[in-house]
Amino acid sequence: MEQIILNILEALRCGETVDDKALVKLIHAEARREGADKRDLAKRRLLPFYQRVKREEPARWAGWNVDAELERQLLQVLRMKPRRTASGVATITVITKPWPCSGDCLFCPNDLRMPKSYLHAEPACARAEQNCFDPYLQVSARLTALSQMGHATDKIELIVLGGTWSDYPQGYQTWFMSELFRALNDDAVASVAANPMLARPGISRAEAGRLLDDAPADALPPVVAERRERYRAAGIATDEAELASGVAGEQERVDVAVGGYNRAVRRLYGPGTPWGEVAEWQAATMEELERQQRINETAKHRVVGLVIETRPDAVTPQALTLIRRLGCTKIQMGIQSLDQHLLDINERRISVAQIERAFSLARLFGFKIHAHFMLNLLGATPDGDKRDYERFMTEDAFMPDEVKVYPCALIEGSRLVGCYERGEWRPYTEDELLDVLADDIVVTPAFCRISRMIRDFSSDDIMVGNKKPNLRQLVENRLAARGDGATVREIRYREISTAGADLDELTLDEEVTYETPVTRERFLQWVTPEGKIAGFLRLSLPDRAFVAAHADELPTTPEEAMIREVHVYGMAARVGDQGQAAQHHGLGRLLVERACQIARDAGYAHINVISAIGTREYYRHLGFCDHDLYLQKEL
């Protein structure tokens, strides 16, 4: 292992490019020389080895003569999955525990090991289950993996999934958020011995779970070891066979429509069960949460974005106020369709009017809106889906900031199976699906980001429907073949990603403006001559008359503008590190200054920013002061 590191360092000193192809050659050559299994020298093991030597054997590390610049280059070579932090932050996704759902959609999976709509084989769900759905344990596991893969973890976006957030008891919501912050504040990073999938590449997730249970105590952060033992003592299983057998009887009844998901979840996770026992201590006060938030303002791992998901009918002023106090900055909202007939026959139990109100409220509260939109629902057609999506992107009541657009897939146990067997629903052909998605990308405006085109379902879980994980690539190939690639404006297609940006070539584009029923929106973006995006800001100028008329529901006054998002792209740089990527070169500050000027010129007396907990210090340095749910600056 050491010799490979030394060979990489020598190549870098000589000015050679060490890309993945060159690294594989170095690994294979060393494996042959040592007569070793090349899996034992895999890329994913090199960085943890380097980090361990630097931390535990300083004399040995000093002999390698690695200065700061050489180390930066080395880490760039050894970093696993660089796309993970290409958007500028490191993302950690966590899953809440199974809980009764206020909806019962026709297409929704009913996996009793998971919260509604999720499957236990999805990567984030499998990790959550191995960690007893505990927020502290989940963050520790992901923080460990990201650190050992070489990613900067100073800036974290937390994504909390699990269906409708507001369905959970308020005490659980507060506890869950408090534990997320606590894990980051504690720097709960385990050693390689506590990350079996890294130490032994290729093993199954189930085997990794068993190895983790046997990890030496000193390999785990103290709270992790204590918490895992607490769940074990309560009888919470993490073994795959136990997990499957524990729900088998109830799952069989749900799959054949004898009883329902909610009834079964109450029996499996309610009072009188091991989960009912641990629920007694899964609660926290708002004061405890706020203490963890204050610590996180200057912590090593700061929360720069916090996301929950919900349904439009659960979006109320009261719910949004609580969500904001918890520290949230973005809401994922299941829309699925704007066709009321489709919503009804797919049993969504929501109306288009509720969707409109949810969007207006979320905007006025300052949240970023990340919508879920589905194709190929029961009753849908390709042409109808195209019209529906275009309406979603262009009608002023909607126009989300971000969207997941993905095709409906048939999952065993969902009530859609009966429709399929009766011939009432069929999946689109690949050609139909690519045609719809290609049209959808083209009509997506410059202020919107298409974050996903597929769910993270395993192909084994999909009975019929798209099973190709590279669907987005196929769609982009279709666009290129049609000659439409140059017309794509959506954000993800234009991100500078892992590439650097020539700051001298960037210009501030202020041309993207649009109106909603309650705001005038300004989308400011730093762009390259080729149209690539290096950073952006979302500015909302609320309708003064509307805000005044709804003063009892809203946390702001008619004289307050709102910055809903500031984001600078490029490989995530550590706080204070002046790297080559676009971050930390004042682009965000310039965006904020321009937004303040626009709001001032429009006659607003104050401007709010929906700051994440970990960005409060940044905005204070820009002249903002704490003001109830936001940070505020006088104009």
Question: What would you call each of these model-derived segments?
Answer:
Residues M1-Q138, R142-Q282, A446:
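Flexible, acidic/Gly-rich N-terminal and inter-domain linker regions that tether
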Residues H120-Q138, L158-R182, P196-H370, M374-D431, ...:
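Conserved non-cysteine loop/helix-boundary elements of the Radical SAM core domain that shape
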Residues L184-N185, E277-A283, A314, Q318-R324, ...:
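C-terminal scaffold of the Radical SAM
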Residues R324, M393-D396, C596, R600, ...:
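Non-catalytic positions within long, well-ordered alpha-helices that form the structural scaffold/packing
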Residues G579-A599:
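Conserved acetyl-CoA-binding loop-helix of GNAT-fold acetyltransferases
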Residues Q597-S611:
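Conserved GNAT acetyl-CoA-binding A-motif
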Residues S611-Y630:
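Conserved active-site alpha-helix within GNAT-family acetyltransferase domains
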